[in-house]
Each structure stands twice: as structure tokens, then as C-alpha cells.
Amino acid sequence: MTERLYFRQLLAGVDFAVGDRETGDALLIDPAYRPRELIDAIEVDEMTVRGVVLTHYHADHAGGNLAGHYIKGTKELLETTDVPVHVQAAESPWVTEASGVERRSLVAHESGDVLRVGQIGVTLIHTPGHTPGSQCALVDGRLLSGDTLFIDGCGRTDLPGSDPAEMYHTLTSRLADLDGTTWLYPGHRYAAEPTAQLGVVRRDNAVLAPMTAEQWLATFSR
């Protein structure tokens, strides 16, 4: 399947595109910034946008108001191409309120749902903590983690909808079964490298160090 996989990091790794090279179908992940340019970029590769996956509702991933600056994001993309926007069910109302994307454009998912883009499967994993409906996308040994997990650290848990206890459960349970050879691609580059294998991240990232929930919350809850 790897030979068919289309995988591209866009805009310094903030946005991603995944798809099937043989069918030319692609999904955009978190197209907040310059969505028309994102479409143009993958069309140069002879790919066509068939849908959007949002890891969570924040403006720098979905579009909306960020510190007084409005990011058109997904809403602008839908003005160019009418495609479904795949979100975790718990995130739907947050996405609509924050980004302005209408509910009719959203497809709500549960954890474990698999999207098909051509013959490529994209598994959606509910990973609450940073937001109620944060989700990661797992495709062909690559985990697109949004703001759930970074190579160094994890998403903030002091924002509207955040829950430190849920973040602990996400890191220690919901993502625990993923193979250590899985490549982590976070939604922000806060480390020297843009990606790392989960085995390395588990070894070096302090938020994944073995500790009880009480210890973790006392150390990282903020």
C-alpha cells in the first residue's frame, strides 16, 4: 500500500495531505492557512481534494479567530471545493462555533472509524484532552497527531474544553497500543526534527514518562 500512498507535509508541516496516487484522491488535514494554495499545491501533483480532516477546532487548525486575527481556513476552502469535513463527534459544535463551517458540511465520527480515500485507509482515533473532540489520524504507519502529542510535550490543557485528566488517559491508554515504529507527525514543529518514531518519543518525551495520574496531573496540568 505504501507505493500508492500520497503523503505530503504542507506549509512547514502545519498542514498535511494524504491520498491514493493511483486514483488521485486526497484528504487535507487541518487546512487553516492559505487553503487555496494548498489545493493548488496538490493539484500540481495531479491530486484532487475529496475531503478534509480536522484534528480539533482551534483556529490555527480549522480556521477562525486567533488573537484578534481571523483565519479563513476551512470555511474558505469549502467556498472553492464542496467536500465533507470529517470531525470527531464531540468536536462538531466547537468547530461550527469557532470556524463558521456549517453543520451540514461536517461528518461526525467515533474513535476507530476508517475513512477511505481511494484504497488508502485513514483510521481516526479520539484523543481528548487538548479539546473534547481532538482526534489523530493514523495512515500507513504515520500518526498525524494535531495538538494531542508533540515530539517534545503535549497539547495545552488550560484552554476552553481542555481536560488534563483526559489528556493523561489519552497518552497512557488511547495511544499506548500503537507500534513504536509508527512515525509521529505533530501539528506544530516544536522540536528540531519534524517527525520521530513513537518508540523514541516514548523514551524521550517527559509527558510519556511512567507515572500515576496524580503524579502526572501535579507535574503537567496547566
Region locations from a protein language model:
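Active-site neighborhood of phospho(di)ester-bond hydrolases with catalytic His/Asp-centered motifs
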Residues: I29, R50-H58, G64, V85-Q88, ...
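A short acidic, often aromatic-flanked loop/helix-cap motif at beta-alpha or helix-coil junctions
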Residues: D15, G112-R116, E214
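Conserved beta-strand hairpin/beta-sheet module of binuclear metal-dependent hydrolase folds
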Residues: M1-M47, C136-G146, I151
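Short Gly/Pro-enriched turn/cap motifs at secondary-structure boundaries
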Residues: R8, L106, H126-P128
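Short, glycine/acidic-enriched loop or turn micro-motifs at the edges of active sites
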Residues: T23, Y33, A59, E91, ...
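Active-site HxH/HxHxD metal-binding segment of metal-dependent hydrolases
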Residues: R34-G121, R203-D204
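Hydrophobic residues at beta-strand termini and immediately following loops
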Residues: L10, H109, L198
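Metallo-beta-lactamase
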Residues: E97-G100, G121-H126, T131-S221
